[in-house]
Swiss-Prot record:
Its EC number is 4.1.2.17. Involved in the degradation of L-fucose and D-arabinose. Catalyzes the reversible cleavage of L-fuculose 1-phosphate (Fuc1P) to yield dihydroxyacetone phosphate (DHAP) and L-lactaldehyde. Also able to catalyze the reversible cleavage of D-ribulose 1-phosphate, but FucA has a higher affinity for L-fuculose 1-phosphate and L-lactaldehyde than for D-ribulose 1-phosphate and glycolaldehyde, respectively. It holds the Pfam family Aldolase_II. The lineage of its organism: Bacteria, Pseudomonadati, Pseudomonadota, Gammaproteobacteria, Enterobacterales. This is L-fuculose phosphate aldolase. GO terms for cellular component: cytosol. It comes from Escherichia coli (strain K12). The record marks 113, 131, 209 as: Plays a key role in the stabilization of the transition state and positioning the aldehyde component. Substrate binds at residues 28-29, 43-44, 71-72. Its cofactor is Zn(2+). NCBIfam families: fucA, PRK08087.1. Inhibited by phosphoglycolohydroxamate (PGH).
Amino acid sequence: MERNKLARQIIDTCLEMTRLGLNQGTAGNVSVRYQDGMLITPTGIPYEKLTESHIVFIDGNGKHEEGKLPSSEWRFHMAAYQSRPDANAVVHNHAVHCTAVSILNRSIPAIHYMIAAAGGNSIPCAPYATFGTRELSEHVALALKNRKATLLQHHGLIACEVNLEKALWLAHEVEVLAQLYLTTLAITDPVPVLSDEEIAVVLEKFKTYGLRIEE
């Protein structure tokens, strides 16, 4: 797909992320795999002011094009693509319920079968590290080895998928799961969860289920 079209999709995803209540201000960032690297949102520009020319290309060596500053979180986007060869899009946000669970430093357990949308029986919480650091990117790479989404302790959420539409869909699903988890935690702790055997059944069914979008 041509660069300008991908850039437009990135901007549309950012705007939709805000519309869904998953993000606010200039927080969060979005990228797509492109050539030997990625296209990513810039730093410090509100989503509603973004144009295609603001979107930044970073090559596979981490070098960005001159005259543009990428999101400070570009390292963990790169780490996500390296950890997940099947991923072509990454969405990061500070969704309220996901961030609240991350502050508790808890993984989201199998409270609902939709947990399997992220690839397993839980959604992990990667350890805290300062934003934009190599240390944080290493935590993200490890957390995403066997999952399509992870919480970031005291920070937010990152979700990756085969395209932007599915990455945003997954991010929204995880936020709903986080809200359900916090609601249930207010009643009982530990919370009731589905068995590993049931999640294995759901994972198998999910091979032919989910958001259907033409690639």
